[in-house]
């Protein structure tokens, strides 16, 4: 009996170990539920990073290999509470899932932006606005239904294997800015009006979705039929002996 259960568990784990772009597609946000990718975080026309109400992170992915990230982090200072630092980061680009299940994200170098507030360092009254480029490699990830909230949850393992805070599906299709370069530097660079049109088109699918509706029943059907098949074979073997 235990051998049968072991075979079933092993087979299910093999079926489950199938990372793909389709299951990543959508906009994911952290528990604060205040940080989302898209024009509500970064305005590429007027070069503005917009501060959310609370810190948090958000990632968006498309099924054809594009991503966007919005990060708002606050770091306290235990020696002086007035010296807390805050940073807003926007990046977008392309991503790929490697054969080992790791996730590699390559940003468009000219588009990354960072807004740093460091009252006891850089300036007490001004924030520092700069370009930002940081490729990202996540060791692994998995998508599952959160047992508490019933929402789809994305759990990411960072490059060192440590767990990132869980992310929950907020938008599907993803809420993103245009996936091409927003700030091209060549002679064919876009005017602000053409960029505005692109941003407007990118918002056509701006609507919320309950993550429960995005539950991937098709994938879990694989588990069911795999388990039924193994149990059937094992039962037949026991009967014949």
Curated annotation (Swiss-Prot):
<dbReference type="GO" id="GO:0051082">
    <property type="term" value="F:unfolded protein binding"/>
</dbReference>
<keyword id="KW-0325">Glycoprotein</keyword>
<dbReference type="GO" id="GO:0007118">
    <property type="term" value="P:budding cell apical bud growth"/>
</dbReference>
<keyword id="KW-1133">Transmembrane helix</keyword>
<feature type="topological domain" description="Lumenal">
    <location>
        <begin position="18"/>
        <end position="222"/>
    </location>
</feature>
<dbReference type="GO" id="GO:0006458">
    <property type="term" value="P:'de novo' protein folding"/>
</dbReference>
<dbReference type="Pfam" id="PF10681">
    <property type="entry name" value="Rot1"/>
</dbReference>
<keyword id="KW-0256">Endoplasmic reticulum</keyword>
<keyword id="KW-0732">Signal</keyword>
<comment type="function">
    <text>Required for normal levels of the cell wall 1,6-beta-glucan. Involved in a protein folding machinery chaperoning proteins acting in various physiological processes including cell wall synthesis and lysis of autophagic bodies.</text>
</comment>
<feature type="signal peptide">
    <location>
        <begin position="1"/>
        <end position="17"/>
    </location>
</feature>
<keyword id="KW-0472">Membrane</keyword>
<feature type="glycosylation site" description="N-linked (GlcNAc...) asparagine">
    <location>
        <position position="80"/>
    </location>
</feature>
<keyword id="KW-0812">Transmembrane</keyword>
<feature type="glycosylation site" description="N-linked (GlcNAc...) asparagine">
    <location>
        <position position="100"/>
    </location>
</feature>
<dbReference type="GO" id="GO:0005789">
    <property type="term" value="C:endoplasmic reticulum membrane"/>
</dbReference>
<protein>
    <recommendedName>
        <fullName>Protein ROT1</fullName>
    </recommendedName>
</protein>
<comment type="similarity">
    <text>Belongs to the ROT1 family.</text>
</comment>
<feature type="topological domain" description="Cytoplasmic">
    <location>
        <position position="241"/>
    </location>
</feature>
<dbReference type="InterPro" id="IPR019623">
    <property type="entry name" value="Rot1"/>
</dbReference>
<feature type="transmembrane region" description="Helical">
    <location>
        <begin position="223"/>
        <end position="240"/>
    </location>
</feature>
């Amino acid at each position: 009996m235990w051998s049968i259960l072991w075979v079933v568990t092993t087979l299910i784990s093999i079926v489950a170990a199938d990372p793909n772009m389709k299951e990543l597609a959508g906009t994911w946000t952290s528990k604060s539920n205040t940080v989302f990718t898209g024009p509500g975080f970064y305005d590429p026309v007027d070069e503005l990073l917009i501060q959310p109400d609370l810190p948090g992170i958000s990632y968006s992915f498309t099924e054809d290999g594009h991503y966007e990230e919005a990060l708002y982090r606050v770091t306290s200072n235990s020696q002086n509470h007035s010296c807390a630092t805050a940073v807003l980061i926007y990046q977008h680009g392309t991503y790929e899932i490697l054969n080992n299940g790791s996730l590699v994200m390559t940003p468009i170098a000219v588009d990354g932006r960072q807004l740093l507030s460091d009252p006891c360092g850089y300036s007490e009254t001004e924030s520092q606005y700069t370009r930002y480029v940081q490729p990202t490699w996540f060791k692994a990830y998995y998508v599952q239904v959160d047992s508490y909230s019933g929402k789809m949850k994305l759990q990411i393992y960072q490059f060192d294997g440590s767990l990132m805070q869980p992310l929950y599906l907020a938008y599907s299709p993803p809420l993103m800015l245009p996936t091409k370069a927003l700030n091209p530097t060549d002679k064919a660079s876009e005017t602000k009006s053409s960029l505005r049109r692109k941003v407007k088109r990118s918002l056509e699918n701006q609507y919320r979705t309950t993550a429960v509706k995005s539950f991937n029943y098709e994938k879990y059907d694989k588990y069911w039929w795999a388990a039924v098949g193994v149990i059937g074979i094992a039962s037949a073997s026991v009967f014949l002996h």
